[in-house]
């Protein structure tokens, strides 16, 4: 199996994101290896030796996705027996030409702490934890969004991801079997209808998830899951609540779709 390296003098997050996004376009499996904080020439030479050894072992050149602000480190890694992709140089040169402004290299700039956005995210994470699964309904006035759905439909991980990644205060509320016996929304949610966003899920997937939690129970039965999913989707439609199916989407995709559909403000930068 061919190896793909993601290397940087910072966190290597940018290299990973660009690299994985690019490789995902090809139906080929890779052995992925991430190496962050390559900040000295000595360390760069060590990594070069590792890359060369990997090429010899695999019988083919590794793919190297890297981001360095230090040109000397770029030169060292680029001289390895590998196919190299330098994202920063590729794009910064074009942008420099367009803006007529020279870039100012700074290590860790991309994923360093920006005080304002950091505070937003910490506050949002604390809010999501305190308002998980219907807790602290009295705080819903502070919410940017309130996710609703049947149990185990993806509300909690999505709430936390929205908070941690984007600084969005996301509460979540479970729609129970009792709630579904009426045609209306739970009374506590009515004042915040404009903040509601629903999640649904395929019954078969829901049953599998619930079975890991409470095996052989009514709660995890496919019949119960089908009833709950059908009823909650009818609830969404009756009350004109936007919703999406989380079955085949990652938490990143779900969150991005929610932000796109609701025009929520990202507080990432």
UniProtKB/Swiss-Prot annotation:
Does Transferase count among this protein's keywords? yes
At the top level, the lineage of the source is Bacteria
**UniProt entry keywords in alphabetical sequence:** Kinase, Nucleotide-binding, Serine/threonine-protein kinase, Transferase
Family stated for the protein in its record: Belongs to the pyruvate, phosphate/water dikinase regulatory protein family. PSRP subfamily.
Q: Where does ADP bind?
A: 149-156
Question: According to the UniProt entry, what is the EC number of this protein?
Answer: 2.7.11.33, 2.7.4.28
Put simply, this protein is called Putative phosphoenolpyruvate synthase regulatory protein
User: What HAMAP family does the record point to?
Assistant: PSRP
The reaction(s) annotated as catalysed by this protein in its Swiss-Prot or TrEMBL entry are:
[pyruvate, water dikinase] + ADP = [pyruvate, water dikinase]-phosphate + AMP + H(+); [pyruvate, water dikinase]-phosphate + phosphate + H(+) = [pyruvate, water dikinase] + diphosphate
According to the record, the segments passing through the membrane are none
Q: What class of enzyme is it?
A: transferase
Molecular function terms, GO-annotated: ADP binding; ATP binding; phosphotransferase activity, phosphate group as acceptor; protein serine/threonine kinase activity
